[in-house]
Amino acid sequence: MTDFSPREIVSELDRFIVGQHDAKRAVSIALRNRWRRLQLEGSLREEVLPKNILMIGPTGVGKTEIARRLAKLAGAPFIKVEATKFTEVGYVGRDVEQIIRDLVEVAISQVREKKRKDVEARAQIAAEERVLDALVGANSSATTRDSFRKKLRAGELNDKEIEVETQSTGGGSPMFEIPGMPGAQMGAISLGDIFGKMGGRTKTRRLTVEDSHELLVNEEADKLLDSDQLVQEAINAVENNGIVFLDEIDKICVRDGRSGGEVSREGVQRDLLPLIEGTTVSTKHGAVKTDHILFIASGAFHIAKPSDLLPELQGRLPIRVELSALTRDDMRRILTEPEASLIKQYVALLQTEGVTLEITDEAIDALADVAVAVNSSVENIGARRLQTVMERVLDEISFTAPDRDGETIQVDAAYVQKHVGDLAKNADLSRFIL
C-alpha cells in the first residue's frame, strides 16, 4: 500500500494527465484515507468505511486514464472493469461477484511476486543446481560441477540447450461445472486444481540455459513459499486495500419511460448494491468481505443522468467529481506535456526507421485547432480525437519512412492544413473520416 501524501499522488498523476484537478484531488484523498485507516486502533478501524467516488465527465477527458495510473501508484490490489460486461444473477453471463474473485486473483499474483523477491537468493541457488544437473548429471564429481558452475556464472553456457523438468501449469486440464454453485466461473472446477497437489504433473522442455533461468527461479521460489499463508495475505490485502474501478456505469442506467431490454440493466445495479455496501463473497480461496473495498465509478452520462441510477446506488457513491470538457489549451498541452505524449510517441516510432521528425509549435497549434473544431462540429470524443488527427497528418510520413532513412522531416502548420484542413471544414466528410 502506497504511503504517498495526496499532494504527491496529484503531482504523480500530473505527469501523465492534463487538467482535471478536482478528480485527481478526490482520488488522492481517497487513496490516502486507505493508509490513514490502517493506522487506527482495531475497533475504530472497522467502523471507518471508504467514501466511494462517482466521476462524471464526457468521453476522452481522462477518467479511465486516472484509473490506470492510480493502479500503478496504489501498490494495492486494483481492478478495472466495465459495468456493461455484467448481467443480473440468473441471466447468462458474468455476475458482479466475479469482480471480487478477479480482484483476489490480482492480489494473489501481487503477493506472490513480492514474496518471490524475498526468497530469490535461495531460489537462484536451487535453480543453478538444476541447470548443472541437466548439464553434467546429478552424479557428476564436485570438480566437474565447479568448473561448469564458473562457466555458467560467466555466461559462457547461455546458448547451450538443456532439457529440464518443469511443473505443468494445468492449462489444458478439462473443466466441468458443478450445478448450483454460486457464480458460473467459480463453479467451473479444473481437474488440474483437484489433482495438482497430488504429485503434480511435470513435463520435459528443451530450452537454452538463458531461457530456462527465469522459469526455474520462479518454480524454485514457489516451492519455498507457503501457499496457504500467501492466499491469506492476498485476501487480507483485498479486504483492507482493494480498489475497484467501475467504468461505463452510465450504460447500466434505466432511462425514464424506457422498458424492454432494461430489466437486466437495473438488475446489475441491484446486484452492485450489496457489493458496494459490504457483503461476503465466496471465492475458491475462501470468503472475502467487501466492506472496506473502495469503489470508484465513472461514466460519461451523455444520455442518462446520474439521477437515473437507483437512489440506493447514488447514496453509496457519496463523493461526486465532475470532469470538465477539454479546451483548445488542454488539447495543446496533451500533445506536448505528458511523459509519453502523442508527439513523443510518434517521434520515437519514426526514429526506429532513422527518420527525425520535427513538429513546430505552429503545427501543434494547428493540430489542437483541428481537433477542437471537429469535436464541436461532429461528436465530442475528447482527447481521443487527437489520435485520429495525428494519424491522418502523419499517414504519408509513416508509409514512406522505411525509404527515407537519415532524413529530417519538419511538420509545420501548412503541412497540417494541407492534410486535414479541408476535412475539418467539411462536417460531412469529417463525420466519416475524422
Curated annotation (Swiss-Prot):
It comes from the Bacteria. One of its GO terms (biological process) is protein unfolding. It is found in: Cytoplasm. The keyword Chaperone applies. Keywords: ATP-binding, Chaperone, Cytoplasm, Nucleotide-binding, Stress response. ATP binds at V18, G60, V61, G62, K63, T64, E65, D247, E312, R384. CDD domains: RecA-like_HslU. GO terms for cellular component: HslUV protease complex. Pfam families: AAA, AAA_2, ClpB_D2-small. GO terms for molecular function: ATP binding; ATP hydrolysis activity; peptidase activity; proteasome-activating activity. A double ring-shaped homohexamer of HslV is capped on each side by a ring-shaped HslU homohexamer. The assembly of the HslU/HslV complex is dependent on binding of ATP. Belongs to the ClpX chaperone family. HslU subfamily. ATPase subunit of a proteasome-like degradation complex; this subunit has chaperone activity. The binding of ATP and its subsequent hydrolysis by HslU are essential for unfolding of protein substrates subsequently hydrolyzed by HslV. HslU recognizes the N-terminal part of its protein substrates and unfolds these before they are guided to HslV for hydrolysis. This is ATP-dependent protease ATPase subunit HslU. The lineage of its organism: Bacteria, Pseudomonadati, Pseudomonadota, Alphaproteobacteria, Hyphomicrobiales. The gene is hslU.
